[in-house]
UniProtKB/Swiss-Prot annotation:
It catalyses: carboxy-S-adenosyl-L-methionine + 5-hydroxyuridine(34) in tRNA = 5-carboxymethoxyuridine(34) in tRNA + S-adenosyl-L-homocysteine + H(+). This is tRNA U34 carboxymethyltransferase. Keywords: Transferase, tRNA processing. It comes from Campylobacter jejuni (strain RM1221). NCBIfam families: PRK15068.1 (NF011650), tRNA 5-methoxyuridine(34)/uridine 5-oxyacetic acid(34) synthase CmoB (TIGR00452). GO terms for biological process: tRNA wobble uridine modification. It is an enzyme of class 2 (transferase). Belongs to the class I-like SAM-binding methyltransferase superfamily. CmoB family. Transmembrane segments: none annotated.
Amino acid sequence: MQENLLEKQFLNHPLYAKIQELKALNLACNFSLDDSVNLSTNSQAKDEILAIAKELKPWRKGPFKIDDLFIDTEWQSFIKFNILKPFMNEISQKCVADIGCNNGYYMFKMLEFNPAKLIGFDPSIKYRLQFELINALAKTPIKYELLGVEDLPSYGLKFDVIFCLGVIYHRSDPIKMLKDLKAGLNKNGVVFLDTMYIEDEREIALVPNKTYSKIPNIYFVPSISALKNWCERAGFKEFEVLATKKTDENEQRKTEWIDSFSLENFLDPKDKNLTIEGYEAPKRVYIRIKI
């Protein structure tokens, strides 16, 4: 029911109609990848593209370049992608899901590694519209579902590789989320996951009071040992830490494409190692887990 409601709202959104008009032009487009997702059309639709893109703010993940329009997103998402890039050979000719895919930036980048099928899950109409704008020009076979991680067990298709980046700390039941990821895997499947974490050798998690780094819907920020225990309780047998990285103001910052505050406003102005609330400043751990 929720899926049908979101899909109906999406199809009735005025920007969806504008994107369909753009798509109907069937513009010739050169699609290329570097740090940005690059689209070169040399078209007469530049004004329309700019107007739609501005209406779709905030743009969180990216960047994207459409002709001479540079969508300078809040996150320099290629930094995270480059951390995972050495492991991208695992998606070649595989059925791949990106859970919490936002506007699809990571999926566009994954195309370079030739997945057999690529499906994004995110129950956000705005992010889906951002994806549709880019894909109206790029014309890729990526599929986007207005669904969440809880829909994986009943989705009807199992995946060889699942990416779940920056999601688990938004869930009030992280072990249930991990079980849902496990239920979405084929035999011998693998999950790549990242989360914010705290430095502590104990098997504990930070439970923020109201906000963490000014973000209201953060439930648990685990130690790496606690994260490992969550994964084991969910039924994963293999747990490997791939990398850790502190989030800095090069990776996440305010731009004209978000119209709101960003990391510099979320940290203690006197001590950048602390959030404005006094917690450890955000840092991320990247893991690979298998059944």
